[in-house]
Amino acid sequence: MNRLTILFINPVLNKEFKLRFRSFKSYLGIFFYLLVLGGASLGFMGILSQVGRIGNIGSEESRYLFIFMSLGQIGLISFMTPGLTAGTISGERERQTLNILLTTQQSSTTIILSKLISSLSYLLVAIFSSLPLYSLVFLYGGVSPISVLASFGVQILTMLTIGSLGVMFSTIIRRTMISVIATYATMLALVIGAALIVLLFGSILLGYNQNPGSGVFWFRYLFLMLNPPVVTISVLEPQFFSQMFYQPGHAAGTSLWIGFVLSYIGITILSLWIAIQKLRPKMKSRG
């Protein structure tokens, strides 16, 4: 059995999958996830039908509905992921089972990745279970399958990054409650804080300089690329962001999703590396 097979097929991962999916509460959670997303989408659809042309929903309103559903799903993912991942290692420590886990033949890399995969697999099931809801969008047109794939790509990468941060905090912080708080604080800084900084300080810079140059452009870009909702809108409505980032003497600007993908992959790799190194702080890592 090669190293890659051992990494993804191991007793730790099998045990976590059984614990995660054998409970009725897990499926009840997915039901309420879809209920909230579907109910909000139907409500927004009703609003669009009232303000649409002659009370009907066309392709333009359908696109607005798709953006609303994508942003709603990012919001649900952002607030559910810390709760699922921030107690993966600290919970074992509090139950006094971590030392037993560390005496097994599983490497630090295998343990960390198994905990992450098992936690995020639950959210992946919830995300893909929402696909039938998007039939409402395809019913009226205005959205291509590429847009759906791009939206799901942003959601999955957001989930992976926040989940990696949760596992990292769970490894370096002994108490689960503090780990959860730290993960939520970091998530809020990425999802909300970055956009607030641009709104507050960006307007100040523009107020002092009526002809902003590349400095202001990159200031806005570097902070907005960390914000998943903003990146989603930039992917689905590129013309809006082309106008926003256009500066005299510059092109429309580097696509926001490029910075998002690179930065979030970097955060994910760094978080997992720290977690792997800190899992066995007093001994040489075996993974």
What are the residue ranges of the model-derived segments?
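Hydrophobic/aromatic residues in alpha-helical transmembrane segments
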Residues: 81-85, 133, 165, 271, ...
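Helix-loop-helix units of permease transmembrane domains in multi-pass membrane transporters
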Residues: 13, 88-121
